[in-house]
């Protein structure tokens, strides 16, 4: 079948891959070009393993993407009316853009943060792995942040590098139920991780981390897991963004009203769309109106990719897309290779009273992580599983019972 529309997907993370695969599996009249800085897919949920030297996190994109995807290895520098401009000078004409650029750890407001490592991307995790291998025995490694990434990182490092001293600065699992927090503390004690909670980092010096109570922690290496930043592509392109630079999208995932991406002059016409090129945002680098419960996670990114693809298709057909309805199921945390937590949650991501903790949780977490890869491959063949509906949908259903 002759293609009628060309869609450019910027970014090949969880959301971008799912969006590309969904479009091509469902609509043979669409051509898709995926723009990504490297030819591999990076499993961000395994980057703490890369840092610890206990696992890998890459897959060839050719093994995950629909066979009709055109992969362009490069970096987008600007989204123009009906085109995406790349750093190598290439200009990709298109009828719609899926904005899926992802996120990374931000420098934040901590003085000296540039001295710290992170596990937010493959290069950073690899640099930390190399630094750990080169460090002398009994090095002091300070991990900043008691959230999910901080917990997975500090426990993985402690288990893989028992000769080093691991210190966690933060309140471990503070958003989780008390029983789960208690188990996490037990696991940290088991691994010999020192915890400094109830305090914040004032600044990072060469050889130490200074806390806001004036105390210092010796630090051969520092790892920051708190905070985030996103690429400034949306801002540079004149698209609507929030204070953090995330693309602002409506509940359909289309960029909010006021987007200056307008086709004029010789701009490629879009059948049924009028004079505005659809820009649809998915993944970590977007903020969705009316969906404050969405957190940065592959659990959200993959359904966002699917919904974003469906929105693109509806817009290309001149139809009003459906609003997003996305609910959470669980929070999975690895605490080393052989322990973990699977915390069930309500649709709005509020933790429930039920959780699986300890040895039994570790293989469940591993199965979930492997399942994300399988799900992307299934979507390329048109067989992805539906996601859980969101909290607003559940409330409406209850009101009509």
Language-model features, listed with the residues they occupy:
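FAD-binding core/adjacent interface of flavoenzyme oxidoreductases
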Residues: 2-4, 69-140, 223
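Beta1-alpha1 glycine-rich phosphate/pyrophosphate-binding loop at the start
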Residues: 2-70, 152-178, 401
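Rossmann-like NAD(P)H-binding beta-loop-alpha module
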Residues: 128-164, 169
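Short hydrophobic core segments
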Residues: 10, 92-105, 209, 217-228, ...
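A Rossmann-like FAD-binding core segment of flavoenzymes
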Residues: 69-80, 84-85, 92, 161-251, ...
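C-terminal auxiliary extensions adjacent to catalytic cores
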Residues: 337-401
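FAD-site-proximal beta/loop scaffold in flavoenzymes
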Residues: 114-137, 216-221, 225-303
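Internal hydrophobic alpha-helix adjacent to the cofactor/substrate pocket in enzyme cavities
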Residues: 20, 291, 299-326
């Amino acid at each position: 079948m002759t293609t009628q529309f060309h869609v450019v997907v910027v970014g090949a993370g969880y959301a971008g891959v799912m969006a590309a695969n969904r479009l091509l599996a469902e609509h043979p009249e669409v051509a898709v070009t995926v723009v990504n800085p490297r030819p591999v897919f990076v499993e961000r949920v395994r980057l703490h393993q890369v840092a610890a030297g206990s696992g890998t996190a890459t897959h060839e994109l050719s093994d995950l993407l629909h066979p009709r995807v055109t992969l362009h290895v490069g970096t987008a520098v600007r989204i123009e009316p009906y085109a995406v401009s790349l750093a190598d000078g290439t200009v990709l004409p298109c009828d719609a853009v899926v904005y899926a650029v992802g996120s990374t750890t931000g420098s934040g407001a901590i003085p000296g943060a540039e001295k710290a490592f992170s596990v937010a991307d493959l290069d950073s995790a690899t640099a930390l792995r190399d630094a750990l291998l080169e460090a002398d025995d009994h090095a002091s490694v300070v991990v900043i942040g008691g959230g999910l990434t901080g917990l997975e990182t500090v426990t993985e490092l402690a288990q893989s590098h028992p000769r080093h001293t691991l210190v966690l600065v933060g309140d471990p699992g503070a958003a989780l139920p008390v029983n789960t927090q208690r188990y996490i503390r037990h696991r940290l004690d088991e691994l010999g991780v020192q915890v400094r909670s109830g305090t914040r980092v004032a600044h990072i010096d060469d050889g130490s981390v200074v806390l806001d109570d004036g105390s210092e922690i010796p630090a051969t290496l520092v790892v920051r897991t708190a905070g985030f930043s996103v690429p400034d592509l949306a801002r540079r392109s004149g698209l609507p963004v929030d204070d953090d630079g995330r693309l602002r999208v409506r509940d359909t995932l289309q960029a909010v009203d006021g987007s200056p991406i307008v086709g004029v002059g010789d701009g490629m016409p879009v059948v049924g769309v009028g004079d505005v090129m659809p820009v649809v945002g998915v993944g970590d680098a977007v903020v969705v109106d009316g969906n404050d419960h969405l957190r940065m996670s592959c659990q959200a990114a993959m359904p966002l990719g699917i919904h974003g693809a469906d929105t693109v298709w509806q817009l290309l057909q001149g139809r009003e897309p459906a609003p997003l309805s996305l609910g959470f199921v669980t929070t999975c945390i690895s605490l080393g290779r052989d322990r973990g937590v699977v915390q069930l949650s309500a649709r709005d991501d509020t933790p429930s009273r039920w959780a699986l903790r300890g040895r039994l949780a570790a293989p469940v977490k591993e199965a979930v992580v492997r399942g994300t890869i399988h799900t992307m491959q299934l979507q390329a063949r048109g067989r992805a599983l539906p996601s859980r509906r969101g909290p607003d949908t559940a409330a409406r259903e209850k009101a009509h019972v």
